[in-house]
Amino acid sequence: MCSLSAIMLLPTKLKPAYSDKRSNSSSSSSLFFNNRRSKKKNQSIVPVARLFGPAIFESSKLKVLFLGVDEKKHPSTLPRTYTLTHSDITAKLTLAISQSINNSQLQGWANRLYRDEVVAEWKKVKGKMSLHVHCHISGGHFLLDLFAKFRYFIFCKELPVVLKAFVHGDGNLLNNYPELQEALVWVYFHSNVNEFNKVECWGPLWEAVSPDGHKTETLPEARCADECSCCFPTVSSIPWSHSLSNEGVNGYSGTQTEGIATPNPEKL
């Protein structure tokens, strides 16, 4: 989620990148802190705003795209996914709400290098709704591997902001079906480092949006083995879970797509 350029150029002494007196319109998104200053003399250091401070969601910086989904359709009957990306040029977030991952948001060398997108999908498992969120920590190239611990820290810190973006962007759905606020949030951290390759339950959605929410390292309930009406969708719209075999890496096994590891239940 954090821009790799910001990770690589952290100053030895962190300085506040924001003044409390600055207006919201001039502040950059707290989700990504690779901010650009107008004066050239200040561009020698990449500012890292609120690196260890509170993460704040700013709705004015969120652009929402509805792509082929009906706001009135419950996600237990129609696939519903979220693709959240950030622009270093505009400092704004883009949230696509669609039936499958919006791959067009993930194109370009910067996106492939930073891997700071967050994707999620609604699932119904044995009659219970849940939101499954996926983050890429490391794998794919050595720079991501080098900063795996730092990336994990940033993702954990900023995920409440991401979830608030989901709630705000898909507000009509949640207003129509308030019971979805009680749906459990499962966060999948994909990494080739065993320590960070895990699944965590962040509790119900209303709690997960809080930075003080309770987190437990555990596994979600598996869908029914046979065809049924209590589980939906039958196939995940997140491609990270079923592609190339990756048995040879310590700590995880099973599948991998473009360097993304799938947490191994037997290792958790």
Curated annotation (Swiss-Prot):
GO CC term (a single one): chloroplast thylakoid membrane
Transit peptide, start-end: 1-48
Keyword Zinc-finger: no
Keyword annotations: Chlorophyll catabolism, Chloroplast, Lyase, Membrane, Plastid, Thylakoid, Transit peptide
InterPro entries per the UniProt record, alphabetical: Staygreen (IPR024438)
EC number: 4.99.1.10
Reaction(s) catalysed by this chain's protein: chlorophyll a + 2 H(+) = pheophytin a + Mg(2+)
GO biological processes: chlorophyll catabolic process
GO molecular function: lyase activity
Induction note: Up-regulated by dark treatment. Induced during natural and dark-induced leaf senescence.
Recorded phenotype for the gene knockout or disruption: RNAi-mediated knockout of the protein results in a stay-green leaf phenotype. No effect on seed degreening; probably due to redundancy with SGR1. Sgr1 and sgr2 double mutant has an embryo stay-green phenotype.
EC class of the enzyme, as a word: lyase
Coiled-coil zones: none
Expression sites (tissue/organ): Expressed in roots, leaves, seeds, flowers, buds, petals, sepals and siliques.
Subcellular location: Plastid, Chloroplast thylakoid membrane
Family: Belongs to the staygreen family.
Record's function text: Magnesium chelatase involved in chlorophyll a degradation in the chlorophyll-protein complexes of photosystem I (PSI) and photosystem II (PSII). Contributes to the degradation of PSI and PSII in the thylakoid membranes. Required to trigger chlorophyll degradation during natural and dark-induced leaf senescence. Mediates chlorophyll degradation during embryo degreening. Recombinant SGR1 possesses high dechelating activity against chlorophyll a, very low activity against chlorophyllide a, and no activity against chlorophyll b.
Quaternary assembly: Interacts with HCAR, the chlorophyll catabolic enzymes (CCEs) NYC1, PAO and RCCR, and the LHCII complex. Part of a SGR1-CCE-LHCII complex, which acts in chlorophyll breakdown.
Protein name, per record: Magnesium dechelatase SGR1, chloroplastic
